């Protein structure tokens, strides 16, 4: 079982979905401090309560951060170092979805500038800002195994013609991760990317806005050859990458969940 005992971990998008599932598993595996940020504070109290039930020894520090702002990201990471003196790992899980099935073919003709820019700012620029500040912080700390995990999507490798901005942002995230992994590895910082398949999170309905029930959403994905997984399935892979059990692994893009090629 992958252990993160006594570690200080930063998690973006940590108040819900994959981020929250990762927080819960990190607490179960003995993390000392979870520094959680999200664009909305509405789920912070529920997260703290759930973590306390799992492991009363794990401290949870929550902050409202917009990852599309490099200034806010920098202040958040600098605050972690100032408050706790270390940063062993980070999970960049903040992201936004793009609705499918609402546009006429060819769907590219209806892609609008504002939607493209909005998604790129969060899913790509946000990952860049966070990874950059995490590496900046980690390189000045004592040498030990340090790990950063970026959360992408199976859309980065699966051909999905109605989610251009989302798929492109996640493909760029995977490529960025492999590049920066080679750059940071000599410093003892491992960086990897996880690409989940269709995951049962609060963001799921945004991908299928025409569906009225969860069953309709699940059935629509089955027709496309996609299987539904749980956030906890992804969290187990993320926590493994944060642990010393994955020490030889860097620059990887790990798919979690089945999908249509």
From Swiss-Prot:
Signal peptide residues on this chain, from the entry's feature table: none
EC number: 1.1.1.332
UniProt similarity note: Belongs to the short-chain dehydrogenases/reductases (SDR) family.
Lineage summary: Eukaryota, Fungi, Dikarya, Ascomycota, Pezizomycotina
Residues of the active site: 166, 170
Induction record: The expression of the ergot alkaloid synthesis cluster which leads to the synthesis of fumigaclavines is positively regulated by the brlA and stuA transcription factors.
Name of this chain's protein: Chanoclavine-I dehydrogenase easD
PANTHER family (UniProt xref): DEHYDROGENASES, SHORT CHAIN, ESTRADIOL 17-BETA-DEHYDROGENASE 8-RELATED
Function: Chanoclavine-I dehydrogenase; part of the gene cluster that mediates the biosynthesis of fumiclavanine C, a fungal ergot alkaloid. DmaW catalyzes the first step of ergot alkaloid biosynthesis by condensing dimethylallyl diphosphate (DMAP) and tryptophan to form 4-dimethylallyl-L-tryptophan. The second step is catalyzed by the methyltransferase easF that methylates 4-dimethylallyl-L-tryptophan in the presence of S-adenosyl-L-methionine, resulting in the formation of 4-dimethylallyl-L-abrine.
MF GO annotations: oxidoreductase activity; oxidoreductase activity, acting on the CH-OH group of donors, NAD or NADP as acceptor
SUPFAM superfamilies the record matches: NAD(P)-binding Rossmann-fold domains
The keyword Oxidoreductase is annotated on this UniProt entry: yes
Catalytic activity annotation: chanoclavine-I + NAD(+) = chanoclavine-I aldehyde + NADH + H(+)
Species the sequence originates in: Aspergillus fumigatus (strain ATCC MYA-4609 / CBS 101355 / FGSC A1100 / Af293) (Neosartorya fumigata)
Applied use: Ergot alkaloids are known for their toxic effects on humans who consume contaminated grains or livestock that graze on grasses harboring ergot alkaloid-producing fungi. Due to their strong affinity for monoamine neurotransmitter receptors they may also have clinical uses such as treatment of migraines, Parkinson's disease and cerebrovascular insufficiency.
Keyword set includes Metal-binding: no
GO BP annotations, alphabetical order: alkaloid metabolic process; ergot alkaloid biosynthetic process; fumigaclavine C biosynthetic process; protein homotetramerization
Class of enzymatic activity (EC top level): oxidoreductase
């Amino acid at each position: 079982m992958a252990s993160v005992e006594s570690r200080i971990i930063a998690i973006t998008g940590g108040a819900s979905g994959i981020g929250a599932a990762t927080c819960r598993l990190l607490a179960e595996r003995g993390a000392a401090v979870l520094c959680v940020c999200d664009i909305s504070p509405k789920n912070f109290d529920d997260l703290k309560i759930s973590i306390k039930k799992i492991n009363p020894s794990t401290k949870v520090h929550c902050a409202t951060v917009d990852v599309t702002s490099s200034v806010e990201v920098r202040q958040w990471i600098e605050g972690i170092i100032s408050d706790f003196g270390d940063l062993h790992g980070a999970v960049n899980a903040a992201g936004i979805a793009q609705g499918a099935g609402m546009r006429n073919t060819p769907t590219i003709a209806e892609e609008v500038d504002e939607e493209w820019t909005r998604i790129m700012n969060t899913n790509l620029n946000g990952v860049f800002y966070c990874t950059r500040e995490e590496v900046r912080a980690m390189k000045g700390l004592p040498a030990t195994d340090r790990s950063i995990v970026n959360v992408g999507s199976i859309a980065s490798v699966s051909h999905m013609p109605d989610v251009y901005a989302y798929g492109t942002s996640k493909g760029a995230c995977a490529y960025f991760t492999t590049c920066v992994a080679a750059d940071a590895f000599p410093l003892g910082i491992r960086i990897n990317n996880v690409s989940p398949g269709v995951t049962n999170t609060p963001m799921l309905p945004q991908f299928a806005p025409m569906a009225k029930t969860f069953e309709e959403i699940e059935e629509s994905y089955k027709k496309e050859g996609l299987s539904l997984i749980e956030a906890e399935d992804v969290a187990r892979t993320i926590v493994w990458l944060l642990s010393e059990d994955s020490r030889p692994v860097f620059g990887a893009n790990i798919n979690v969940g089945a999908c249509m090629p």
